[in-house]
């Protein structure tokens, strides 16, 4: 194992990440998509994704004083759902989405929520900073999902929770082929439809304590304990 990485090696997506989907997606492209849809995101996706958000918050079991990191906070649609006796940090790399989130947090007086512009694959926090690290509907929207999850694990405290809600490719052979077929189309609204859940878990090394289907059968809530 090399002691030092070349800078260009750091920027190159993990080949295992690329193998999880038939589609490559670049951060600049995704940022452009979310810049365009920021104003209508809540209307387009709020209702259909809301059950998964509620279930994730319920399953987290947030305790008073817990430090929670939401990776991919978007428009801050989750912000008002968190109990006020915890500390929430929300990060996103889209200035347009964060502008909506900041307006929401200010309007609702959510003093326990802070928002920061940041790349999910390069979290600017010390190791073991958070009790719960949560990525709602994110990992199929980034160029390197494995790198993002490694960062989530790094900043999660030992025995803390890593919580992921995401669309994964169906285990049904017919639906699986459909997921792969439409992924080149769904990428135009900012996500890959064919991310493989077993492959994702194997490559990240995450060991789930629970996996549940949410909203519709193709979305899953995955909760892992950080060892």
Regions found by a protein language model. Give the residues of each.
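Conserved class I S-adenosyl-L-methionine
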Residues: 4-63, 77-78, 100, 108, ...
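C-terminal alpha-helical "lid/dimerization" subdomain adjacent to the S-adenosyl-L-methionine
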Residues: 21, 25-28, 45-47, 163-221
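Short glycine-dipeptide loop
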Residues: 65, 156-162
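Class I SAM-dependent methyltransferase SAM/SAH-binding core
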Residues: 67-122
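A short acidic, Gly/Pro-enriched loop at the edge of an enzyme's catalytic core
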Residues: 121-133
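A short SAM/SAH-binding and catalytic strip from SAM-dependent methyltransferases
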Residues: 132-144
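A short glycine-rich, Lys/Arg-flanked "PGG" loop and its adjoining helix->strand segment in the class I
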Residues: 146-158
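C-terminal lobe and adjacent flexible extensions of AdoMet/dcAdoMet transferase-like proteins
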Residues: 222-227
């Amino acid at each position: 194992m090399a002691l030092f990485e070349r800078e260009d090696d750091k920027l190159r997506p993990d080949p295992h990440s690329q193998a999880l989907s038939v589609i490559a997606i670049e951060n600049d492209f995704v940022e452009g998509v979310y810049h365009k849809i920021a104003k209508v995101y809540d209307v387009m996706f709020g209702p259909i994704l809301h059950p998964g958000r509620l279930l994730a918050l319920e399953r987290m079991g947030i305790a008073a004083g817990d430090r929670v990191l939401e990776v991919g906070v978007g428009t801050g649609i989750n912000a008002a759902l968190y109990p006020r006796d915890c500390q929430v940090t929300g990060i996103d790399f889209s200035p347009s989405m964060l502008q909506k989130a900041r307006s929401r947090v200010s309007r609702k007086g959510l003093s326990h929520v802070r928002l920061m512009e940041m790349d999910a694959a390069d979290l600017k926090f010390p190791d073991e900073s958070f009790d719960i690290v949560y990525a709602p509907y994110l990992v199929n929207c980034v160029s390197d999902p494995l790198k993002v999850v490694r960062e989530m694990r790094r900043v999660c405290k030992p025995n803390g929770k890593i919580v992921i809600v995401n669309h994964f490719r169906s285990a049904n052979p017919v639906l699986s082929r459909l997921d792969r077929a439409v992924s080149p189309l769904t990428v135009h609204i900012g996500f890959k439809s064919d991310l493989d859940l077993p492959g994702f878990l194997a490559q990240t090394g995450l060991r789930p304590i629970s996996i549940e289907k949410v909203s519709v059968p193709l979305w899953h809530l995955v909760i892992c304990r950080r060892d």
